């Protein structure tokens, strides 16, 4: 009975806040000297024909590509999304100030960037998780891109989540439905010379790992090798399933990063719904089995349990790390760094290692 009560509280927390609707995607006039973020979008959602730039939860039979320019308000606080309450106002809220549809070729060219740019050929792909609408995924990526201040191209792979707490099973099917389309996007980027970093959250982590596994089984090693790094944030993946996936997946050039929290309430609900013993996103870095998993599967496991949560479920802490992403990337790209578990004691805080750490995670 106590477990059912906890599950009820989690569900209430996940669904209690008012959700932003497609009206937040209305294109408005930019404010003077506004900071902007350009996001490339690849989605297999069905477009909402009645609302420009909006998408439904329907599963589409083809990919749609676009470029969306988002204005960040002057008073923006790191890790927050200043949602508009009515018509978007760039002075106080995130706002779309430009949008255009793209062909697949245009998408790939824009993703590669200018030859003389320091970010040439570098991109970050965000694969959202369960219970996300198109606008929520779009603005979350814009927030992370704005906070990180890295020049890499921001790319959203948006799969058709129901954006409903009760849509867990449907979302699982939609994530599986999206595997081929994510593989297509990765192939297009690879052919254009783009080396992406993939940040996949929650159920999106399952989608990302499954897609890389699929590419490996198809012999598409060139595409797999083009991935600069794979970061799994609060991955909603059963531990046994993750082991099985990685056993037939070509090893990436860098360790796969797992951002985990022992107190992730959403993953606790997921485990209950799926009947799973443990998920990768709730690994305990003090457990010897976690050490074994990290060393065997080429993982860097980061405990982010002390990073502030944005909505009380402790499932969204990854968004708070965007501000220190350049330092995180520097730490993980250290060529002498070994795999093993890392402990992040808060944003910009100290790093300790219960078993192996080859290099500092955060540049001090």
Explain the meaning of each model-derived region.
Residues 2-9:
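Sec-dependent signal peptide recognition
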Residues 182, 200-204, 208:
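Gly/Ala-rich beta-loop-alpha elbow adjacent to hydrolase catalytic centers
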Residues 116-122:
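Proline/glycine-enriched tight loop/beta-turn segments at coil->beta junctions
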Residues 132-137:
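Short substrate-entry loop that stabilizes the transition state in hydrolases
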Residues 13-16:
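C-terminal motif of bacterial Sec signal peptides marking the signal peptidase cleavage site
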Residues 18, 22-101, 110-113, 138-142, ...:
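Lipolytic serine-hydrolase domain surface
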Residues 197, 201-202, 231:
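Residue in the alpha/beta-hydrolase core beta-strand immediately N-terminal to the catalytic nucleophile
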Residues 125-129, 201:
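The conserved beta1-alpha1 loop
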């Amino acid at each position: 009975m106590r477990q059912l009560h906890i599950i009820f509280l989690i569900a209430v927390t996940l669904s209690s806040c008012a959700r932003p609707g497609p009206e937040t995607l209305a294109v408005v006039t930019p404010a003077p000297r506004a900071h902007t973020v350009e996001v490339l979008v690849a989605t297999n959602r069905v477009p909402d024909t009645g609302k420009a730039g909006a998408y439904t939860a329907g599963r589409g039979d083809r990919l749609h590509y676009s470029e969306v320019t988002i204005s960040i308000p002057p008073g923006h606080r790191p890790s927050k999304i200043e949602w508009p309450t009515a018509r978007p106002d760039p002075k106080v809220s995130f706002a779309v100030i430009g949008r255009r549809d793209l062909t697949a070729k245009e998408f790939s060219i824009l993703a590669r960037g200018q030859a003389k740019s320091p970010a040439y050929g570098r991109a970050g792909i965000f694969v959202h998780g369960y219970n996300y609408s198109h606008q929520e995924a779009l603005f979350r990526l814009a927030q992370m891109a704005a906070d990180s201040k890295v020049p890499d191209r921001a790319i959203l792979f948006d799969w058709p989540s129901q954006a409903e707490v009760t849509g867990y099973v449907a979302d699982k099917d939609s994530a599986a439905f999206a595997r081929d389309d994510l593989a297509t996007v990765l192939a297009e980027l690879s052919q254009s010379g783009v080396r992406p970093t993939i940040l996949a959250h929650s159920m999106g982590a399952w989608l990302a790992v499954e897609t890389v596994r699929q590419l490996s089984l198809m012999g598409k090693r060139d595409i797999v090798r083009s991935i600069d790094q794979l970061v799994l944030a609060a991955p909603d993946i059963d531990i046994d399933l993750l082991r099985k996936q990685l056993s037939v997946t070509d090893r990436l050039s860098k360790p796969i990063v797992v951002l985990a929290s022992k107190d992730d309430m959403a993953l606790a609900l997921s485990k209950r719904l799926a009947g799973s013993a443990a998920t990768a996103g709730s690994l305990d870095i003090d457990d010897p089995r976690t050490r074994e998993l990290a060393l065997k599967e080429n993982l860097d496991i980061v405990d982010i349990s002390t990073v502030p949560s944005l909505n009380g479920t402790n499932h969204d802490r990854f968004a708070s790390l965007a501000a220190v992403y350049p330092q995180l990337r520097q730490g993980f790209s250290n060529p002498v760094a070994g795999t093993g578990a890392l402990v992040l004691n808060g944003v910009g805080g100290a790093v300790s290692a219960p078993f192996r750490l080859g290099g500092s995670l955060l540049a001090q």
